[in-house]
Amino acid sequence: SQRTVDAHSKKDWRLGRASAGNIIPSTTGAAKAVGKIIPELNGKLTGMSFRIPTLDISVVDVTFRLAQETTYEEIKAAVREASEGELKGILGYTEEEVVSSDFIGDARTCIFDAKAGIALNNKFVKLIAWYDNEWGYSNKMLDLIAHMATVKEIKKVKHLTYCN
């Protein structure tokens, strides 16, 4: 949906601008979707996207105000432990000096970039995670199909369909 040269866009003036030479602020439905999936977060987060001239990798930049004090080192240790344990293959962890193209073809949901995050203090942190929004997403759809194949019954509740 992104134009390669400046042209008229009915939807959004900025999206009509040339993609190859611009970073274009845009909207995202991700925060709204998270609120639907995790009701406790509904209305507590927002977000935006930037259309940038890159092949297919995206990055998430999330700023948290923490309920209790913790150090950035403790956060890194917890993410690393999860990436090597219960979330192995889903959550990645890196301390390498990475750029977007390093994640092309990565099937994991996201890869935490330990060197890119920062802590303003022990209650306010910024975390960065990369993901392949084409290959990674396709792999998550395959995971979902495999899971659905094991489910005996599908129930509908309000707006959500869930497996039982």
Place the predicted regions along the sequence by residue.
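C-terminal substrate-binding/catalytic lobe of Rossmann-fold NAD(P)-dependent oxidoreductases
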Residues: S1-V125
